[in-house]
Design a protein with these regions (language model features):
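Exposed, low-complexity/repetitive linear segments and helix-based recognition motifs
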Residues: 58, 74, 81-85, 92
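C-terminal structural segments of small proteins and small subunits
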Residues: 62-81
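Conserved short "hinge" loops at termini or chain/domain junctions
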Residues: 1-48, 84-101
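Short, hydrophobic/amphipathic alpha-helical patches that form generic packing surfaces
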Residues: 50-62
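Short coil/turn residues that cap or connect secondary-structure elements
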Residues: 12-15, 60, 64
């Protein structure tokens, strides 16, 4: 995802790689924190990957930071309310129907 983010932002050097990787890891931890299944975080499908990239862009793209931050929150909420994405054993606030308490 690092190279994809750099391409989106037109970054053609490695000066920000460490920071971008930090944000990538933070996004994964944030999704894990709401109970997203580990396998989808480790090997993301297009919805999870898009959420992770949007999270990073909310920090990297200063001009559009608020837009990306709001988009990430919406994407995260959709993932959190989709039962296939939730690890019920890791999220005690989700009942058997996938509904948050």
């Amino acid at each position: 995802m690092l190279e994809e983010i750099k391409k989106i932002q037109g970054i053609n050097h490695n000066e920000f790689d460490s920071m971008i990787n930090t944000w990538l890891e933070a996004a994964k931890l944030d999704l894990k924190g709401i109970g997203i299944v580990d396998t989808l975080i480790d090997t993301p499908n297009s919805l999870v990957q898009n959420a992770i990239i949007t999270y990073v862009l909310s920090f990297l793209d200063v001009t559009n930071a608020e837009l990306y931050a709001n988009s990430y929150l919406l994407q995260k909420d959709v993932l959190r309310h989709t039962i296939e994405y939730i690890d019920e054993s890791a999220s005690p606030l989700v009942d058997s129907m996938g509904v948050s308490a």
